[in-house]
Amino acid sequence: MPGQKPVVLFLTNSEFGQSSVVLAVAQELVRQSACEVHVASFSALKQQVEALNVAFHALPGRSMKEALCDSGLPFLPKHAPGTRGAVESYRKGLQHVVAPWEPAGYEPIYRACLDLLDKLNPDLVAVDPLFGPGQDACNVRQCRYLVLSPASFKDHLVQVQPHLRVLWKYPVISSGLPCPLPLFLIIINFYLIFKLVLHTFLSKRVQTLTKWRNHIGIPGDLTTIYANFNEKVPWLLPSIPQSDFPLKIPTNVTGCGPIIPPFESVAHNPTASWLAQRPTILFNLGSHMKYKLTDAQQVVTALSMVLHTYPDMQILWKCELSHDDPSSKEPESSDSSAIQDLIPAELTDRIRVTSWITPSPMSILAHDSTIMYVHHGGSNSFHEALAAGVAQVVCPVWLDTYDVAARVEFLRVGLRGNGKAAPHLEGSELGAAICRTAHRLRSGDMGTRTRELQAHILAQEEGVSGTGPADVYGVGRRKAAKVILDMITA
């Protein structure tokens, strides 16, 4: 109808690691008021979507996280790097990531996506690459769609690199191998790729779901398998060429820069005055990390080493105790006191412990006092740190987080914090990694690199309308929104 706004529909998993880029781009589209925005996901995402004044459509069935729990997995199982750990991750973890639902759980979600496409008749659909029912529905209905991913170039493009570089140049997921691969590790990479194909792509779970899909009229293999990169649809990613390993980027892929939702400034938060006192390290291993007291003690050992070496620094530590820990008899209400008892008295004013970071981790990273981010290697954390221009210490625990650890070292913007102890932490090893990173910041070379990458992110802004040229945190979402608007108005 004349004057009616075009409709953009986002189909996504509800887990924040996947949906954060959807929330960011949806909010930017709403800000520009150029289209009608809808988001379809599971009920866990409803409150966040509706807070953006965006129409939310609840999907039936189990979310990805719930489906993994139904399979007996604690979301994603931790594993060690190296040959044995990687093979174990393919056997127990990765096949469930690409096929979290069995046919009985997949079908109602897929049917609901079909119904929603028929009802809304969107001008464009943006799909989460790990949300298979959504991509299948778009392909069956022959909708115009693109893929919006929080992951890196390497995650999606390694298998389409020329000259079989997937085999001999880039470390396979879960391996913890460096990039570029030294000659003596190439044979191990070969072996792990074979095991990945065997235990993931050719697993009974994946093959059963694939055959069922084909039987009900869905063509091809699972769209969630990274090896099935679709060169016929546009892709939007938070990577830029300077923030990843050297790769050949197909013309249907747009690197936007970090795709970060708008966030509240820390200026009016009680934390602001504490942050302003000293250079600050943010230590946040993610919401999945629940510490046993023995793990917390290792962190305290590391932080004590750092603060005795650098008496002008302080650390904000997100720490929540696991109440499944048999070694801890502390009730939940005494988490804070149990952790505080581990911290040396002379350091209590320089280690602030919190069970939840307010206003948000991004708010802390954006503060002028923050100089370093210690995190688990999630793609969102990595890209947030790049945008903030801070150094990184990565403590990987599973799958692609080992790639992120290799990536920060390759880019010279950080170090790995648990090279020997992964997927766990060992105090002296972690403390030494943080100290080395701090030294390189103070000596200038790492600080120069983080600022260079931040400048490359800002350079993506050309031709994109925004709030100002210095708003590095909005570059990615604005560029992604521009691609979407260009597509629906072409």
From Swiss-Prot:
Q: Which GO terms describe its molecular function?
A: UDP-glycosyltransferase activity
Q: Which Pfam families does the record match to this protein?
A: UDPGT
Its pathway, per UniProt, is: Mycotoxin biosynthesis
Query: Per the UniProt entry, what are the Gene Ontology biological process annotations, in alphabetical order?
Result: antibiotic biosynthetic process
Q: How does it sit in the membrane?
A: Single-pass membrane protein
- Identify one Gene Ontology CC term for this UniProt entry: membrane
Source organism's superkingdom? Eukaryota
Q: What is this protein called?
A: Glycosyltransferase buaB
